[in-house]
């Protein structure tokens, strides 16, 4: 690690209480203690492999030049190239980016994908950008991180505030500099550029599978079980659609403006949101706040928006029997402890929302082979990998009297630690 990145890592490891990074580090510390790993393991696993902070200039449509901070954190490359999304969001910072890259590391190891973890992004509100400005910002950010990414090094993907269009621009920018087409440099691309069928819905599909299996393990028939979903975007919408198709009853969903109940069809509600930009005042619905949604008396609650949705202040009101974390880090440690004390089964983010990176892996494999799968093959293979991980976590939690979060973290951390030991320390 360079001197600069070591300083950044040190700065990133002094987070405020219950920040995403503090939460991630506390979970890692607990996993290391439970696994009886050494302080050498802690020192290795708690430190990002590489941190890049860049200035991203943007020429606005009116000719003004504005500067934005960009990041790319490669937390681990021990098990393979690092993998993780690119966020465009005004509130991202180094601490959050390191935390999310760390979670990606354990997520990839838990699902046994041959990847390490990464995360990146630009501190910008994408809603303030024109299409041309978004393209210029995406391409300039790509050019700034270009020396450290590649299909065998670090593979970005869409995240909050980015989509397949951004991935197309990133792939093209990298390919133009390489002198030939390199579709495998990113995943989540349009189908015609080497994307995979099933990638758009993959995270939501994985959440739906996690909900179904958690209900079965709790002895609850999924058919007719009730679900409330906070968030109705890339994860929440597709999860709601898949759950409805499985026969579950999605009784409430929300976006940043608040939530709604009483709708008849998830697809019709989504169409209304696309046409109006909000769920507010959707015909035939009743409104509720996001906090009220968290406290509904449903079988399953799915927080699928941003982090820190369930906190010490809101956790005691959670009445759901099961919480399935569709978002990254939606629960603070204090909120987690309260729900555990209240007997709520929490399916952690690194398991529940791993469908996205699993199908990203499929896309990467297809790009490397130039051989593409059917939608049915993608869904079957996603289910196989995720079901195996769910079974491993559930069995470990039961056998060792752990929470599912503890079991999932221990499995992921143990695999990365083992890989570190087997590779050794150079020189």
Predicted regions and their residues:
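Glycine-rich, N-terminal phosphate-binding loop and its surrounding beta-alpha-beta segment
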Residues: 54-126
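Glycine/serine-rich phosphate-binding loop and adjoining beta1-alpha1 elements at the start
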Residues: 89, 109-223
